[in-house]
Amino acid sequence: MALGLGLIIAIILFKYKPTYVVSLCGEQIGYVSNAAELQNRIQSEIIDMDGENIDFVTLDNMPKYELKLVEKSLTTNEDEIMLALKDDAKVMYKYYAVILNAETITYVDNIEEAEEAVEQIKEEHKDDTIQLDLAVTTNYTENINEIGIQSVEVAKQEVEQKVDILIEEDEKTK
């Protein structure tokens, strides 16, 4: 009996290998041989994603793992799983709006430089007769492509053009 059991185990180990079936929202998305390695990869490549204007990344649905014996010929597909998870991830981007008299003039990605430019413009026009309510606000979006981010130099030029228009309009009314 022990010989028979040993033979069955040998056949199973010869034909099958232990592999994790990975599913997301109840849908099978692939196979991995090491669930811990995939979790580390998810953490480093998705959750801790680093890039321009990225504030944070969330995964609403974490993958589930189920250990199964599958045929040895089956190949794992960690890269495809990572692509599916990246598609499911929500990336929140941070950007800054330069506002003049309650009107958003432009968007930038560096708050320190934007605030410095705003202070320079305020200083240059402190003796003018018009009221300049200039500010920089922090904003967030999931789609950075919908925002036209400018360099701070371009933003400063756009604000100065608007200020010049306001000064001209103010002088015409006098």
Question: Which residues are covered by each model-predicted region?
Answer:
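Membrane-proximal envelope biogenesis segments
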Residues: 1-174
